[in-house]
Structure formats: C-alpha cells, structure tokens
Curated annotation (Swiss-Prot):
Residues 356-374 have a biased composition (Low complexity). The gene is med8. Belongs to the Mediator complex subunit 8 family. Residues 117-146, 175-211, 398-478 form a coiled coil. One of its GO terms (biological process) is protein ubiquitination. This is Putative mediator of RNA polymerase II transcription subunit 8.
Length: 524
C-alpha cells in the first residue's frame, strides 16, 4: 500500500468530470475537438488509476497453504479433480464398456482372441480411411471454388494513358515538331538505303571490268595453200590449275592493220602470271597456318592457234630438265617456328623467253602470208602450230610434281615443329634444374653455418663431385640432341632437291620457223 496515492487520482478524476459536465451545460453548440481533448485527459487519468489498483491486488492476493480432505470446503478454482458425482458416473461407464467386451476377449484362450481383434482393427482402419477420404473431397471442392486474386500483368502507367486517350482524347494529336522529326527520320533511312544500293552497283561494275574476257576472236585459216582468209572463229583453251581447279587464262591475239603491220597486245604477262582467285585464297590460308607463301604458279598454255596444224620440231633443239636446289638454312630461332625459303617458279612465258634467242621478226612473204598470230613475247615471234595434247599432258605432270612438293614441305614443317617442341622442353627442364640447384644451395648454406671447418671441407668435396656428375649428364644430353639433329638433317637432305616442274616442257613447240619455207600440211 506504500507509494500509492489513490486519493489524488480520484480527486483529479472528479474535477475533470465536473469540468466536462459544466462544459456540456454551458455550450449549446459543442466543438468536437474540445470534447475529444477532454475525454483523452479523462481516459489517461483512468488508466493511471487502474495501474495503481493492480499494484494493490498484488499485495492483497492470498492462497491456502494446507488443503483439507473434504472437497466441499475447497473452492472450485483450486480443485485438481472432478466432483464425486462425475467420478462415479465415469466409473460406471467404464465398467459397462468392459463388461460388454469381456465376452469377446478371453485371456485364457489367446488363439480365439486373435480373429475378433483383427476384425476390430480392420473396421477401425476402414472408418479412419473414410474420414480421410471425406476430408480430401471437401478440400478439393474448396480449392475448386476458391477465388484467386487476378495478377496485374499490365503496367498501370500504360492503363492510365489508355484511359486518358479514350475518355479525354489526350495524346492523339501530334505536334508539328514531332511530324517534322518523323519525316526527317524516314528521309534519312531512304537516303541511306539508296546510297548502299549505289555502292553495291559500283562494286559490281568494277568487278565486271576487272574480270578478263574469256573469249577472243582469232582469224581462221584455210586448209589450201592460198592467201585468202575465212571468217573469224573463236577458240578457247582451258589450262587446269593445281588441285583440280580449272581456270580460263586466255591470251589476247596480236592485231593486223590494213598495211599488214603488227600491233602489240594489251600486257600479256598481266593475265598469264596472275594466279586465279582460288589460288590466292589458298595462299592466304597457308599464311595463316604457317606454310610458306611462295607456291609455284601454274603453267598456263597461252596459245591461240588452229588445231588442224601439226608442230614442226627439230631434234637438235630441246630443253633438258634440271633440278633446282633449295636454299634453306637449318637454324631455327629459339621458341619460334623456322621459316622455309623456296625459290618461286617461273611462268611459261618467262621460260620461253629465256630459252628462245632474241631474234627479230623475219620479213613477211606476201605470197605465203600466215594469218596466225600469237600473244607470246608481246608480238615479237610468230611460232608455228602447237600440239595442245602435249601441253595438257605437261600440265598434268606439273600438277603431280607440285603436289609432291607440297607433301615434302609439310613433312619438313612437321619435323621442324618437333624440333622446336623438343627445344622448348629442354629449356623448361634446364630452368627446373637451375631452380632446384638454387634451392639446394640455399639449404646447404643454411646448414654450413652450424658446421665445423672439417665438415665444411667434406661438404665442398661432395658438392664438387655432384657438379662433375651433372656436367657429364648434360654433355650426354647435348650429344644425344646433336645426333637427333643430324638424323633429321639427313632425312631432310633428299627432300631438299625438288625437280623443275618444267622438265617435260619442250621448247620446240614454241620455236620460230622460217615463214618463207613454211608450208602448212593439209587436213587428213
């Protein structure tokens, strides 16, 4: 009871209640804010009073220390068991249940008690299953009829814009600036497309102009020994390129003026020596892989003559085949693939110009003037007819030799790659050995500091012996590497001599004959 001032709280409550009463009596039109303020004050005072009264209850609460045996004297809140009437009633119910079931279960006969017990358990389980099934059915019905809250899949801002457009019509009209911007954007896209189309057309025209014409008109000759000319006919000679890729390399013929003079062709070697686009692409691929860029060019038969003439060859003039040695140095750089240098093959026109003598064109006989003109040598020579079959056979043999050369080059590259790998491995091993030696030396120096002078001398002798053994082992490794390099060098030596692909080429087919004594044979 100490510390509790109930009188002051009661007096304040009474005073506040009187103030509220006087306020209600005096004011005809009540102000809701004033009324709420007064009731808030009153409720606060009442709450403080309740807290003080609860403290009083804690100090006044009592409980019995001893309970009598008579239940009638014990209050209901302190009882721990039922009343005697309920206990007797419960006891009677239990006795009735036991008396009913005592006939089914005989403790003396256990075998007879098992079947009825099983039936009882089965019926009990069946009822439980039915109850479970009913619960499941009810849960399914509830889940079917359950209402789900729709998810807001659309953005509220978009919905607001749609409502404002449909209800108020806002945002339908487009400003003049927006219209101009849209028109400018459309015009820019149209101009860009037109410019791209123009560039494509210009590139196609340039490609068409750069491609050489595959057909040239040549004046045909009569079979009879006359000076009359027949109408011109077109002849196309196809020369196969290596790898089975066929490409047309035509030769523009020399033109004759009305006076019988010869005009120069438009740069014959530009068309002869230029490789086909397929070969250029192959060269680019080889540069990426690592193969040498210098691939022998394909010999192309740039001859435009009549197929009815037979060649007139002299046995004294022939070209012998020679072997072209390769100038390669077997000194690969460390950790770098060695490069192979191969002399580029000469074209047929250059070989012919080197073989043939530098002679000027002989005087033209007006009686036996031959209308056949060749584009070889810029119009300086007038060779006789060429056997096209021999030229084709020569190109086939050249293709085979080029393939063999490529195989040999690939073998050399593989061998050199193996050498480079071995060198890298050796360098790594040497570095590892050096690291191990450094670690051992550090450990030895640490141990030497704690040893006597005699022990230090013994350790130095042992270290010298180990160094001598290591030097011997390194010398053996170097000798083995030298032997391997010599063996590889011996294997590469027979592959370094590559035959000249033009050894089957006969210069007699391009040899100049005296036009005064030349009489072309008739057709058989």
């Amino acid at each position: 009871m100490n510390g509790v001032d109930i009188n002051s709280n009661l007096d304040s409550i009474k005073a506040k209640a009187e103030d509220i009463r006087n306020l209600l009596l005096t004011t005809s039109t009540g102000n809701w804010e004033d009324i709420l303020g007064h009731f808030v004050v009153l409720s606060g005072e009442y709450g403080s009073l309740v807290r003080e009264v609860n403290n009083i209850y804690d100090s006044v609460a009592v409980f019995p220390e001893q309970v009598t045996g008579d239940p009638n004297l014990i209050p209901n809140l302190l009882r721990t068991k039922l009343s005697p009437e309920l206990e007797t009633k419960n006891r009677d119910i239990i006795n009735q249940y036991v008396s009913k079931n005592s006939t089914h279960y005989d403790p003396g006969n256990q075998e007879e008690n098992i079947p009825p017990l099983k039936l009882h358990i089965k019926s009990f389980n069946d009822r439980i299953d039915k109850v479970d099934q009913e619960f499941e059915n009810k849960i399914q019905q509830i889940s079917k009829h359950k209402l789900t809250k729709p998810s807001a899949s659309h953005d509220t801002a978009i919905l607001k814009d749609i409502l404002s457009i449909t209800m108020l019509g806002s945002g339908i009209k487009i400003n003049a600036q927006q219209q101009l911007a849209q028109q400018q954007q459309q015009q820019a896209t149209i101009n860009a497309l037109q410019q791209q189309q123009r560039l494509l057309n210009a590139q196609q025209q340039q490609q068409q102009q750069q491609q050489p014409q595959a057909l040239y008109k040549l004046p045909a000759t009569n079979t009879a020994n006359t000076s009359t000319n027949t109408p011109s006919s077109t002849i196309v000679i196809n020369s196969p390129s290596p790898g089975g890729i066929h490409h047309n390399v035509p030769t523009p013929p020399t033109n004759l003026n009305a006076a019988g003079t010869r005009t120069s062709p438009p740069n014959v070697q530009q068309y002869v020596n230029s490789p086909p686009p397929q070969q250029q692409q192959q060269q680019q691929i080889n540069t990426v892989i690592g193969t040498p860029n210098t691939i022998p060019t394909t010999p192309t038969a740039t001859v435009s003559t009549a197929a009815t003439y037979k060649p007139v060859a002299s046995p004294q003039q022939q070209v012998t085949s020679k072997q072209v040695p390769i100038q390669s140095t077997n000194k690969p750089l460390p950790q770098q693939q060695p490069s192979i240098q191969i002399q580029p093959q000469q074209s047929i026109v250059q070989m012919v110009q080197n073989v043939l003598p530098n002679t000027t064109s002989p005087p033209v006989n007006n009686n036996n003037q031959s209308p056949i003109n060749s584009g070889i040598g810029g119009g300086q020579f007038k060779p006789s007819a060429i056997n096209i079959a021999n030229a084709n056979s020569g190109t086939s043999t050249i293709q085979q030799q080029i393939q063999l050369q490529q195989q040999q080059l690939q073998q050399q590259i593989q061998l050199q790659q193996q050498l480079a790998q071995q060198q890298q491995q050796n360098q790594q091993n040497q570095q590892n050995q050096q690291n191990q030696q450094n670690q051992q030396n550090q450990q030895i120096h640490q141990h030497i500091q704690h040893l006597t002078p005699q022990q230090q001398a013994q350790l130095q002798q042992q270290m010298l012996q180990q160094q001598q053994l290591q030097q011997q082992f390194q010398q053996q490794q170097l000798s083995q590497q030298l032997l391997q390099q010599q063996q590889l060098h011996q294997q590469q030596q027979p592959n370094q001599t590559i035959q000249n692909p033009f050894h089957n080429f006969q210069a007699n087919n391009f040899r100049v004959q005296n036009p005064t004594n030349f009489n072309p044979p008739q057709n058989q």
